A protein has these predicted regions:
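Active-site loop signature of alpha/beta-hydrolase-fold enzymes
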Residues: 65-67, 114, 183
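Short, solvent-exposed amphipathic alpha-helices that sit
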Residues: 84-99, 157-161
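ATP-dependent adenylation/pyrophosphate-handling site
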Residues: 22, 26-83
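Residues at the C-termini of beta-strands that transition into short coil/loop
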Residues: 61-63, 110, 179, 212
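A conserved beta-strand->alpha-helix junction
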Residues: 62, 98-111
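Flexible loop residues that form catalytic
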Residues: 65, 111, 144
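Metal-dependent de-N-acetylase/amidase catalytic core
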Residues: 1-34, 79, 103, 116-291
């Protein structure tokens, strides 16, 4: 007799959420992920433990982590933007080696830090092409929460890339989110998703992954490998890590009400301008069925 689960296999999320055999059980889950993160170190902040509990993770960086404006770079950065980008690249390779991710599974899409939304069409095409080649079971990325304009761009890239694949009749991976940071009650909140009443999904759909002592040590070592980012990374705790299915976002509306975290930092991008660019891109995408 054929098992009902063979005819209707559980979704990747249901497999991850299974309390006995899922990602919180400590057993490695036979699902292949691609992580799309905005900058080198984002993958360690949000999903270092997840990477170790899944099969053959591939990590894709949306940008090189090097802003054009020297004032937006790490105090430890010296020299040209290209030199800083190389430093960020080398730190990522060293950090991910600690998680067993080999260099052929570490990819850069070529965006510039702080400017991903301006390159959104090209970045989405590149990522869709990668997904078609790799055919992962899941993609893990940032949530749309106004923490960093490049984080929000990563969420948009994943959403559009899946639609590109669907138009071409190709398989689309399930999309999950990890935590990063956002503004709440006047403070930067890390390690949590935006509350449900802000339209960001249900807390009942979240998985809180408690890291083992060994995983905590490895995460600390990975964070330490990002020598240039130590001032920023000091605000992040070691665990737990959280995952949830990505909601269907309206990228033309503000993620949370009020001011966004990156707006409070007086960066060049504003939420209003980001959404204006996103709306124009999405309108063009809808008008061009061949995209």
């Amino acid at each position: 007799m054929i098992s009902p689960n063979f005819l209707n296999p559980p979704s990747a999320w249901n497999r991850l959420a299974n309390p006995v055999t899922g990602i919180c059980s400590g057993i490695k889950v036979d699902l292949e992920p691609v992580l799309l993160v905005a900058h080198p170190d984002d993958e360690t902040i949000g999903a270092s433990g997840c990477m170790g509990r899944l099969q053959n993770p591939t990590v894709v960086f949306l940008t090189d982590g090097a802003p054009r404006d020297p004032g937006l770079r790490s105090p430890r950065a010296t020299g040209s933007r290209a030199r800083y980008a190389r430093l960020r690249h080398d730190e990522a390779i060293a950090a991910l080696a600690l998680a067993g991710v080999t260099t052929h599974r570490i990819l850069f899409l070529g965006g510039v830090d702080q400017e991903a939304i301006h390159e959104i069409a090209l970045l989405a095409e590149r990522f869709a092409s990668l997904l078609a080649q790799i055919q992962p079971d899941i993609v893990i990325t940032h949530s749309y929460e106004g923490g960093h304009p490049d984080h929000d761009a990563a969420a948009l890239v994943v959403a559009v890339s899946n639609r590109m694949l669907a138009r071409q009749g190709k398989p689309t991976p399930e999309v999950l989110e990890m935590t990063s940071y956002h503004l709440r009650d006047g403070k930067c909140v890390t390690g949590e998703f935006l509350p449900r009443d802000w339209g960001q999904g249900s807390a009942e759909e979240e998985l809180a992954i408690q890291l083992s002592p060994e995983e905590q040590v490895r995460k600390e070592q990975m964070l330490s490998a990002y020598i240039s980012q130590q001032v920023v990374l000091a605000r992040f705790s070691i665990g737990p890590e959280r995952l949830r299915p990505a909601p269907a976002y309206d990228f033309t509306s503000a993620p949370p009400p009020g001011k966004l975290w990156y707006e409070s930092l007086s960066w060049p991008m504003t939420g209003e301008r980001w959404r204006e660019i996103a709306a124009g891109f999405l309108a063009d995408f809808e008008e061009n069925p061949c995209a």
